[in-house]
Structure formats: C-alpha cells, structure tokens
C-alpha cells in the first residue's frame, strides 16, 4: 500500500490539477503515468451543464469509438427466426429466446452486452431485476433494443461505449488502453465529445461541456483544454 501511495504522490506532483492541458499533452501525461503491470484503461470524465434530477436533462446514449476500446466483449442477443441467424453471422456469442432467459435466471451471465429485438422485450422485461443492477438491461436509447440486431452486434464488437450522466451530471467512459497511441486516444475522445454535443438536451442552459479530464486506471486526472480538442478534430 505504501508503494501505491508513493507512486500516486509522484504522479500528482507531475500534474497541475488546475491547468488545462492541450489534448495531446494531456493524453501523453496519462499514458506516461500508466506504469501498472497491466494495460490500464484510459478513462474520461466529462462534467456537463445539466441538472440530472430532471428527466429531460439526463444525457444517455452510445457511440462507436473509431479506434475501438481495446477490450473484447461477449454479446448475448435475445431474438428468434431470421434475426437469430443474422445475429450469429454478425458475431454474437450467445443467441436465444426463452432458452436464453432460462439461463439468465439460473445465473449464467457469461456476457458483457445484451441486445434484444423488440419482440423479445416481453421476455427480457422479466429479467430486469437480474440484468438491471449489472447495467445489462437493453434500452433503445443506447441502440440495444433494435429490429436490426446484426448491426447492433457489429457495433458492440467494434468498440461501442454507452454513456449516461450520473447523479452529479458527469459522464464516465473508457476511450481505450494505455497501449493505444496518442492519435487513437484523441480520435476516440473526439468521437465521444462529438456524440455528447449532439445529445445536448434542449433544456440545458449555459455552458454545456464544463470540464473534461482524462486518467488511467491507477493514475491521476488531467484536465483537457477543449479548444485544442476542437482544433485537432
């Protein structure tokens, strides 16, 4: 524990928490600080100018990161008939209907993403108490309830991330791994910020993108100068 504390203290000493860093420098600092013995995630926290207590200001959606997330995901699809074949062809790991629901009820949750065709929601809806707390419940707002399950599977496999404001109005997302180069992480960050801009609620007033900070799993947060992010896009 002492080693971890010393390491964090050293990292904090290299970063000015109040400074806005150009996007490439911010990412380079975070990558340089990612010295754990595993390939750390590179995460972003975006403070939005919304009131998450109001339903019309909750920001929720998904975006396919152009450079992927660096993580392989197992995808389960609730569907039947031709859609089932299409889902398998698209790379789904598990495809089923009532049989898949039975497996979920038994506690067999060997998947990271759940997709459902609209006709399957009568079955999936009964699994809310199991899937919901794990963040696995399909939702049309993030593209996981859709008649085009094949496209949804491809998106999930390609590096789609889901986002939603927390109770403080902050979006948390992973934009890659420490092994990614700066350009890849910048492109992914730009794609996420662009998606958030497009998802801005009409009821949001004042400054919308208030603060953007990047960090690694075991590192410290580095604030990003938004002007440089736009300039690099």
From Swiss-Prot:
GO terms under biological process: regulation of translation; translation
Transmembrane segments: none
HAMAP family, A to Z: Ribosomal_uL1_B
Family: Belongs to the universal ribosomal protein uL1 family.
Keywords: Repressor, Ribonucleoprotein, Ribosomal protein, RNA-binding, rRNA-binding, Translation regulation, tRNA-binding
GO MF annotations, alphabetized: rRNA binding; structural constituent of ribosome; tRNA binding
Disulphide connectivity of cysteines: none
Function: Binds directly to 23S rRNA. The L1 stalk is quite mobile in the ribosome, and is involved in E site tRNA release. Protein L1 is also a translational repressor protein, it controls the translation of the L11 operon by binding to its mRNA.
Lineage: Bacteria, Pseudomonadati, Pseudomonadota, Betaproteobacteria, Neisseriales
Organism per entry: Laribacter hongkongensis (strain HLHK9)
Assembly notes: Part of the 50S ribosomal subunit.
SUPFAM superfamilies xref list: Ribosomal protein L1
Record's GO cellular component terms: cytosolic large ribosomal subunit
Name the record gives this protein: Large ribosomal subunit protein uL1
Database matches in PROSITE patterns: RIBOSOMAL_L1
Family annotation (InterPro entries): Ribosom_uL1_bac-type (IPR005878), Ribosomal_uL1 (IPR002143), Ribosomal_uL1-like (IPR023674), Ribosomal_uL1/biogenesis (IPR028364), Ribosomal_uL1_3-a/b-sand (IPR016095), Ribosomal_uL1_CS (IPR023673)
């Amino acid at each position: 524990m002492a080693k971890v504390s010393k390491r964090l203290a050293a990292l904090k000493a290299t970063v000015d928490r109040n400074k806005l860093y150009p996007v490439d420098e911010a990412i380079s600092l975070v990558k340089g600080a990612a010295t754990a013995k595993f390939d750390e995630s590179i995460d972003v926290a975006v403070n939005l100018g919304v009131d998450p207590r109001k339903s019309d200001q909750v920001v929720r959606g998904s975006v396919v990161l152009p450079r992927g997330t660096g993580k392989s995901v197992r995808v389960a699809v609730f569907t039947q008939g031709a859609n089932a074949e299409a889902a398998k062809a698209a790379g789904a790991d598990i495809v089923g209907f009532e049989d898949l629901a039975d497996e979920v009820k038994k506690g067999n949750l060997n998947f990271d993403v759940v997709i459902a065709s609209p006709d399957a929601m009568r079955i999936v809806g009964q699994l809310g108490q199991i899937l919901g707390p794990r963040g696995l419940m399909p939702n049309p707002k993030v593209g996981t309830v859709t008649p085009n399950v094949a496209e949804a599977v491809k998106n999930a496999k390609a590096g789609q991330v889901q986002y939603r404001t927390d109770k403080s109005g902050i979006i948390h997302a992973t934009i890659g791994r420490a092994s990614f180069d700066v350009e890849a992480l910048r492109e992914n960050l730009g794609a996420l910020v662009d998606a958030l801009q497009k998802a801005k609620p009409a009821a949001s007033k004042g400054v919308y993108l208030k603060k953007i900070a990047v960090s690694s799993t075991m590192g410290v947060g580095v604030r990003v100068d938004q002007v440089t992010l736009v300039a690099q896009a």
